[in-house]
Structure formats: C-alpha cells, structure tokens
Amino acid sequence: MIQVESTLQVADNSGAKKVACIKVLGGSHRRYATVGDIIMVSVKEAMPHCKVKKGDVMQAVIVRTAKEVRRADGSYIKFDSNAAVLLNKQGEPVGTRIFGPVARELRARNFMKIVSLAPEVL
C-alpha cells in the first residue's frame, strides 16, 4: 500500500536509488497503490553520471510492497521492502536490468518487459 510521500527503493539500474511517491495515478481521489499500479515519483537519491538525476519527476510501476497482496486463490504475498521500476513516457523501463524478485501480478498488468528482465517472479 503506497500513498503520497511514501518512499520506495528503485529495483533497476537507471541510476536512482530512492524515490518518493508524489501522485497515485488512476482516479481523481485514489489514495493507495499496490503491486502493478503506476505512480508518479520524484527521485530523492541518485548515483552520479546516470540516466536520471535527483529531482526528476517520472512514472514508476510498483513491483514489491511490504503490505501483503491477496491473490485470487486466497494466498497472500508480501515482501521486505517497497520497490518500484522507473518508466519512460512510453511506459517502458528506463533501466536494462531488474534487481530482486517481482510479483506475478505484473504479468496480468502486461508489464512483460519487467517480468522477463526480473531474476525471479513470485
């Protein structure tokens, strides 16, 4: 469950390390986002000489949340941290590698590029 001002780790090699949610997309008064949702983020920490820099505003898709997500079969999945993958204007990942596991819900949301780059899909 991600809301405005939540901080997330970045799970790709775009150069950003931490981002903060500044808007949950998908409705005028939508409050929370979960795995597979797209949010607007501001880069808070970034490595030097990389694709993104501190202060950049971009879209991101949530790939891991510490709050459990209920699946259709009744099982739950949760992770140790909140993490996102940065997206460009076309909705494609900015980075070329994904770090750590990602949730299976991304496949249902048609983020096939992220699923194929991820080392593990849970």
Swiss-Prot record:
One MF term in the entry's GO annotations: large ribosomal subunit rRNA binding
Record-linked NCBIfam families: rplN_bact
PANTHER family documented for this protein: 50S/60S RIBOSOMAL PROTEIN L14/L23, LARGE RIBOSOMAL SUBUNIT PROTEIN UL14M
GO term, biological process aspect, one: translation
UniProt record similarity statement: Belongs to the universal ribosomal protein uL14 family.
Gene Ontology CC, one term: cytosolic large ribosomal subunit
CDD domains xrefs: Ribosomal_uL14
Species classification: Bacteria, Pseudomonadati, Thermodesulfobacteriota, Desulfovibrionia, Desulfovibrionales
InterPro entries assigned: Ribosomal_uL14, Ribosomal_uL14_bac-type, Ribosomal_uL14_CS, Ribosomal_uL14_sf
UniProt cross-references to SMART domains, sorted A to Z: Ribosomal_L14
General function of this protein: Binds to 23S rRNA. Forms part of two intersubunit bridges in the 70S ribosome.
Presence of keyword Transmembrane helix: no
Subunit record text: Part of the 50S ribosomal subunit. Forms a cluster with proteins L3 and L19. In the 70S ribosome, L14 and L19 interact and together make contacts with the 16S rRNA in bridges B5 and B8.
Name of the molecule in the record: Large ribosomal subunit protein uL14
UniProt KW RNA-binding keyword: yes
Keywords: Ribonucleoprotein, Ribosomal protein, RNA-binding, rRNA-binding
